[in-house]
């Protein structure tokens, strides 16, 4: 209680004025009375805290009574963590009703006033896991007989966010339990799958493939709910969480010999950045990266306290799991490290660990108080609130850990025949190993060491030429020519950055179709081949010099070679579709390919003849051209679905999605800085393409100058910078860009309604599809 004494003495010094030589007796008595009151308040605080420590008993023997809020008068004499937080959403818990084992006696315990919302979030997460992923056995997360973990660890969470924050933490617990019971390779796979889910939102421009597993479905649902509350703060949490799972991948089970080696690793593994994201999102805080970096030296002992306390209370649970499922000869736990480092038994190691927890807790309180005195007014209030909230996290975690079944009740030894049941709690994708994926690649194919393009064929020809100059002319069994040259342009365009929207769409739709994995991969490959072919041909036909920030394929390989390669991809796509062993699938492939070319022909015709189409003509062209591949995907998946006669009709949704995708592209072409970097500024104007904004402008208010510029573009091959500015001025005058964005909003709303309808029709929620739509929202 040294801190309380100091603060009281300081307060007394501030209240009592310097006594002048002639001071009235009344004033002197009043000052003495003030000192007496302050001393009485301090003494009461000291007795309450001392009583708490002296009466400490093991938590499992303590009474499980409800949280007992104390009066405002009582609260005023108990030391608060900092002046940065004025409690709004929590009650102070009477220290005589719980036991902190003397680990953090300087810190108060608060519990959220709406703790039932935290319980609701934890239970909802467990139900979603059972429904989307698999059975849950011997699991306990945030819930406990006394306190919910989040309700005491983040007691000042904004009430509207408490349920989803607890849901997120429960999901993290479920994921963590998988890691505790699998080997390193499978653990890395689980973490990589989780990281891909976050990466698909954080870095949509990267080629990130999100799994279609049940766990990814649940992750997508969680991400959508977080983004809907506050997108910027949610993105910080997702970035922090991504950093955690990426850091965990490949880092399990190090053979640490000393605690000072282990603790920095454990702090990261515990989720220092993750907890930063949880607190800031929960409390609605915005902290700049620079400020967060400055605070690291302050918060290090806080996270060391949390890490050590977690290891202390979870020792029995982790040791049982270690003995039942040994994935290493070593444990990653502070108790284990201390026993090795100091050659002591378990009880002595626990005492040492307790001392370390107290020391690090006291050090954080000291650093925090000093920082607050020196930095107030120099740093943001949100940073100070975050540092104060960490004190609540420490006391909340210590007390909750003593009551939670997660650490105090342990599952029995697993029977051998129950191994497959444990696997049921993970996604189907979790059984895939790195070896499975590499078997299907061409990396292992050995190529000749020569540099010639016709290497193997030339070697044979040269050897025969040495024997005879006539022989090859009569030889009708010459080696087959390699496809290296014809595929090179297509491999180039395939290597360019891509958002893989079509892949994500296929994975999302398969929530409803359940197409077997092998056939699903065939459909993906066929669609990829068609898409890459159309990209190469489109860039030639539009005379576009850039594709995703790189030179277009025909700029690198020439027009003739690019056309030939694109045509070859059509043949490969047809061959791939044949592997589906379905005449109906071939008919779908041919029909949609014909429609795609009809749509493209009209787009080219309008541009070449500077003929503005009507809105209806434009939309039908989009349905044929852009929507064609989405229609093909849905129809092929419906034909290969094992749910014959029960597959949903997605024609409305795929048509709307194709329109949304194309019109979004029209809008981004004129408005997006990212699009400018990848394709050039207002490239559609250079190409003379009749996009929706241009069609709206010309039909709303016909303009001779704009039409003249389009004709001059046809002559010159592109528009100058100044001409583009003039064109944009006319679009602004007719509010065509505002109209386009408004139409995108209407379509987005209708797409969400289509998803609602299909979810009701199929009885299956589709969070992957909802997340994809969210990523594409303008």
From Swiss-Prot:
Residues 415-778 are annotated as: Prenyltransferase. The keyword Transferase applies. GO terms for molecular function: lyase activity; metal ion binding; prenyltransferase activity. Isopentenyl diphosphate binds at residues 499, 502, 531, 548. Residues 414-431 have a biased composition (Basic and acidic residues). It holds the Pfam family polyprenyl_synt. Its EC number is 4.2.3.-, 2.5.1.29, 2.5.1.81. CDD domains: Trans_IPPS_HT. Residues 416-454 are annotated as: Disordered. This is Preasperterpenoid A synthase PvPS. The gene is PvPS.
